[in-house]
Amino acid sequence: VSGGVLVVNGSLTSNVTVTNGGALGGSGALIGALAVNGGTVAPGNSIGTMTVTGNFSQTGGVYQVEVNSAGQNDKIVATGTATINGGTVQVLATSGSYQRNTTYTIVTATGGLTGTYGGVSSNLAFLTPSLSYDANNVYLLLEQAASAFASGAQTSNQRAVGNALDTASPTATRHVA
């Protein structure tokens, strides 16, 4: 896929390569390898899982992951290995009241995982995304941003209210994103 978007909601028996200018989406199954080489992969139709019966690799490009406040998220599940060599995870969060310090599994590879993403970004103002890895998974963690409310202040009164909210927020059990 070198231009446009391929959406797989059923099954596709083929190796798929996504390059610059191309995108792959859907909640279907790829019977074959998936290689993202500078393009975009966006599992789900809204939130969903893309299954790869084979190996998954990503070199550069963007992995768009939707998450919601119910703890659900897009995910790539590979029955083979996953090899990550840079690229960016772009978190697209729906509105809602998120649990602080929620972990989402965004990649699972039965055959093992090697490498890391180069960065992660998010559309959430008050939660900071980070990534962690184990032998088979990539995890996305959304944590309370430090001085989140005060950082948006433009006046001394706004800053005072923001500081009060930042002081209270570490003990809060939920957070509005």
Q: What residue spans do the PLM features occupy?
A:
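Extracellular beta-strand/loop-rich repeat segments of large surface/secreted proteins
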Residues: 13, 19-105
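Extracellular repeat-rich scaffold modules on cell surfaces
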Residues: 1-20, 83-84, 151-167
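Outer-membrane translocation/initiation segment of Type V secreted surface proteins
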Residues: 90, 94-177
